[in-house]
């Protein structure tokens, strides 16, 4: 196995759905299935925060979600937890600046997909030099889903990464909705990542379809 190509990674980032059980008011397995039917291109398991599952329950839930992703041929990424990613033989892992360092993650994960959340050009360059396949840049807009977010960057912050010669695939993170998706792609992102825009939508399927359309129109 070799590392994923930049072109392939860029395509996978188009509509990136992030979810845990506590992000949904409906059955999370059904929400994921609808999102996959609607056209998400990659999925990240993020079981964190108030009411999140732990221990064996968390592992079982992750396996159920992973099995559904496999049915649709969509990569299954684990948020932060490298050990869980290895245990599940996940397609990759996404880490933040406060999580395990990228060099150690790359050693453990081999050629699997590694994404890194970055907020500055320095963080971005460090992540790229040490083996990141893509960057999560944000928060682009204010968000209530994640309580531990940094200052809002806006689309200008995202555009600044491209202006500074950062060419690695980038996914925009934070407060992204159907209405503002186009502006994120136009600022230089390869795709958008969302939690509540799909997980809390009246129809996860319809919401995903609209996000896919917005990204396609803007690329």
Curated annotation (Swiss-Prot):
Catalysis performed (reactions): 2-[(2R,5Z)-2-carboxy-4-methylthiazol-5(2H)-ylidene]ethyl phosphate + 4-amino-2-methyl-5-(diphosphooxymethyl)pyrimidine + 2 H(+) = thiamine phosphate + CO2 + diphosphate; 2-(2-carboxy-4-methylthiazol-5-yl)ethyl phosphate + 4-amino-2-methyl-5-(diphosphooxymethyl)pyrimidine + 2 H(+) = thiamine phosphate + CO2 + diphosphate; 4-methyl-5-(2-phosphooxyethyl)-thiazole + 4-amino-2-methyl-5-(diphosphooxymethyl)pyrimidine + H(+) = thiamine phosphate + diphosphate
Pathway(s) this gene product operates in, as recorded in its UniProt entry: Cofactor biosynthesis; thiamine diphosphate biosynthesis; thiamine phosphate from 4-amino-2-methyl-5-diphosphomethylpyrimidine and 4-methyl-5-(2-phosphoethyl)-thiazole: step 1/1
GO cellular component: cytoplasm
Record-level Gene Ontology MF annotations: magnesium ion binding; thiamine-phosphate diphosphorylase activity
Binding-site residues for 2-[(2R,5Z)-2-carboxy-4-methylthiazol-5(2H)-ylidene]ethyl phosphate, renumbered to this chain: 143-145, 175, 195-196
Cofactor: Mg(2+)
UniProt cross-references to SUPFAM superfamilies, sorted A to Z: Thiamin phosphate synthase (SSF51391)
One Pfam family, short name: TMP-TENI
Cofactor remark: Binds 1 Mg(2+) ion per subunit.
InterPro entries referenced in this protein's UniProt entry, alphabetically: Aldolase_TIM, ThiamineP_synth_sf, ThiamineP_synth_TenI, TMP_synthase
Transmembrane stretches, start-end: none
Keyword Lipoprotein: no
Example GO BP: thiamine biosynthetic process
Keyword Protein biosynthesis: no
Residues that coordinate or bind Mg(2+): 80, 99
Swiss-Prot/TrEMBL keywords: Magnesium, Metal-binding, Thiamine biosynthesis, Transferase
EC number annotated for this UniProt entry: 2.5.1.3
Binding of 4-amino-2-methyl-5-(diphosphooxymethyl)pyrimidine, residues: 44-48, 79, 117, 146
NCBIfam families tied to this protein: thiE (TIGR00693)
Protein purpose: Condenses 4-methyl-5-(beta-hydroxyethyl)thiazole monophosphate (THZ-P) and 2-methyl-4-amino-5-hydroxymethyl pyrimidine pyrophosphate (HMP-PP) to form thiamine monophosphate (TMP).
Family statement drawn from the similarity comment of this UniProt entry: Belongs to the thiamine-phosphate synthase family.
Name of the featured protein: Thiamine-phosphate synthase
Protein source organism: Bacillus cereus (strain ZK / E33L)
